[in-house]
Amino acid sequence: GRVTLQAAQAMLGRVYLTMAGYPLYDVEKKVKAKELFEEVIDYADAKKKFWAKDAEEWKNIWISDNDNKYHIFEIQYIMAANYGNPMVYWTSPSVSTDYISISMSGNGSVCAAPLDNFFKEERNEKNEYLDVRCLATIDTIKTFPNGKKYSGEDFFIKFFEHKIKRTQLGYGDIDAQIVERGYFPINFPLIRLEDVMLMYAEIVGPTERGIDMVNRIRKRATGKELTDEEKESEAFQKCVDNERRKEFAGEGIRWHDLVRHNDMQPIKNKFYYYAEKYGGDPMIMSYADRVKRGTHIYPIPDHQMKVNEGLYQQNEAYR
């Protein structure tokens, strides 16, 4: 693969929008970001690229047969030792062989309760989850097809190409080719058209095109568009944030949104709340304690610190 013009424009636009938020607040960068996002969206619309037209097609994005079709820029993986997507194992608990023949030893970065509940808020007249992204992103199973019980939290399956998922979507079985947990071939998106659309909507607000960006994504997922109340400025921004939270769950984007909006402390407070709710859970408490002043930026990698001792000073939060 190669980096396309649209990938460069999308990534640069994201950088500009990041600079417009916390802690730099260089708001003039929003103009540059908007221009770049418009070019990417216009290109995608004209060429009919990067977009799944309906909910059923959206589910197929997360099948390796469709790698390099929907994402603007992605990390390439193949079905070979140490060249597969490690995300699958990291986010999977111990599952039954109905899913996959190899052992998944339960690393299980499970879906946090607030996101889990958020996905499940609305149901249709058949009492099914209204948002199709819910069951395409997380598995809510409590009894595996072979009768084995699962008592853990709901877990991410967006990148998990298990046997049941591929069969349901009409794809062939690749189970025999996944000989160990480092063989999963599904690519990992670095930026998608939906990301560009929602960042654009965040910048322009509830304009005609801003509303259209949100409605395209929301209607595909739920069949519903924004209400008149949700088209008001403050409510609209909340809707943009909510769509980002659901659309990109498990893709490593949420933290950067929280930093850009300077929402780290409210989220930290939520972690403390849930820690207390679950009897002072030390693991949840430790997650909250990791968020402190200065952690909005990453540490300088250790191997870079050692290239030339004294050349760099480690970022304050990590000293």
Task: For every predicted segment, state its role.
Residues G1-Y83, E128-R319:
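Acidic/polar-rich alpha-helix caps and helix-coil junctions
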Residues Y83-S96, Y273:
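Short, polar loop/linker segments at the starts of domains and inter-domain junctions
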Residues T4, V110-E121, P301:
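Residue-level signal for threonine
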Residues V88, V110-A112, S151, F156:
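Intrinsically disordered, low-complexity, compositionally biased regions/tails
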Residues S101-S103, L115-E121, G223-D228:
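Charged, low-complexity surface segments at secondary-structure and domain boundaries
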Residues T91-D116:
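Short, cationic low-complexity segments
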